[in-house]
Amino acid sequence: MENWNKYIPEGMKDILFEESNIKLNIEDQLRKIYKYSGFSEIISPTIEFYDVFNSNIQAIPQEKMYKLFDNLGRILVLRPDMTTPIGRITGTKMKDCTYPLKLCYTANIFRVNEKLNGKRGEITQSGIEIIGTNGIKSDVDSIVTAINTLLSLGLKNFKIELGEAGFFQALTENMEIKEENLKKLKEIIRNKNYVALKKFLDEISSKYSKEDFELIKNLPKLFGDIKIIEKAKALTKNKKALKSLDDIYNIYKSIENIGLEAYISIDLGMVQNIDYYTGVIFKGYVEEVGDSILSGGRYDNLIQHFGIELPATGFAINVDDIMIALKKQNTMSMDKDKKVLIFYKEEFLRKAYDFMQELKMKKIICELSLLDDDKEILLYSKKKGIDFIIGFMGEEKLFVKDLKSDKIAFLKKDEIENLLML
């Protein structure tokens, strides 16, 4: 039997040193953004019962879930998303809360992916949920929060594409078509495959009204600015479809009034495999990442599976993809703290320790040297990115070496503190 003790499973990744610091910094920024936007953070368990995710509107197929068993033989899963656990928490622990609830989270989720497809099996997901209100104000709040979050992280040249789940549903609800064919139709539209769509519709055209046929045929082309809404309205008299178009238009106009319309585009060909979303849906894209970095929308039917009927909307950000985009855009902002290494003669250990503690209180990264040899100390400091080496070698002034300028000085403690605070 092969020994895998030196490897990690497909789709997993070790995150080391600077990359780890950057990721934690992004997560910290996200938490602050949500906090100052009025959202309260919640934490759910990594392991849930499979039944939590086993519903006919679940957005994650069961074959994408990591499964295991507890000691009673019950099926468990590593959570494949965060929205469903929040639905469970809301339905079971927040029935008496004041609504609307504004919740946020940052956590790892787990999804089984095919080998060699380049996708991660463990993803850090961060997002918000607005629960208990079904007006467009909450949809606008969710989308605007998404835009401001990406801007606050320093991301450039991104777009939020708006669609409406009810639009496609309205066009196909009276259509006599097998489930597998409907799924195929959705996939063709999502991929904007005009040739395949025309061929597919020609084969079943007798099941459509002429209007619906023309509109569905044009769905892959109906993306762009707000003018797309009027173009789509001219192609249908379907009342439900028209209402969906009005909802997108009204949401767009609210975002325009705020002054963030430059980040919005419309995509009426945004359809979903499973009827998870019930209203406006949106995805965030940036050139540097091939897949969406953010997705969200209205999901009014989820929480009822946990004992209470509540409308909800929200979004989730893929933190790992955000890191990739920020790195490629060279806009990764991170405050660089000064780093200090203190070496000492044994009789000055207490003084060295006390000074290290003083520097830490001033938010300076500081450590005592575990090495005694001068050359080893210098080599370690350079590889570790240390800015200053400080030596406690006598009672008076301290040895200070600036590794950037390579200058050496002998200074008093207060002079060193002033130097480090520059």
UniProtKB/Swiss-Prot annotation:
Biological process according to GO: histidyl-tRNA aminoacylation; L-histidine biosynthetic process
Localization in the cell: Cytoplasm
SUPFAM superfamilies: Class II aaRS and biotin synthetases
Keyword Metal-binding: no
GO CC aspect terms: cytoplasm
Example GO molecular function: histidine-tRNA ligase activity
Major location (coarse): cytoplasm
Metabolic or biological pathway, per its Swiss-Prot or TrEMBL entry: Amino-acid biosynthesis; L-histidine biosynthesis; L-histidine from 5-phospho-alpha-D-ribose 1-diphosphate: step 1/9
Pfam families associated with the record: tRNA-synt_His
Stored Gene3D superfamilies: Bira Bifunctional Protein, Domain 2
Superkingdom field: Bacteria
Keyword tags: Amino-acid biosynthesis, Cytoplasm, Histidine biosynthesis
GTP-binding as UniProt keyword: no
InterPro entries in alphabetical order: aa-tRNA-synth_II, aa-tRNA-synth_II/BPL/LPL, HisRS-like_core, HisRS/HisZ, HisZ
Subunit structure: Heteromultimer composed of HisG and HisZ subunits.
Role played: Required for the first step of histidine biosynthesis. May allow the feedback regulation of ATP phosphoribosyltransferase activity by histidine.
Family from the record: Belongs to the class-II aminoacyl-tRNA synthetase family. HisZ subfamily.
Other observations noted: This function is generally fulfilled by the C-terminal part of HisG, which is missing in some bacteria such as this one.
NCBIfam families given in the database record: hisZ_biosyn_reg, PRK12292.1-3
Protein name: ATP phosphoribosyltransferase regulatory subunit
Protein species of origin: Clostridium botulinum (strain Langeland / NCTC 10281 / Type F)
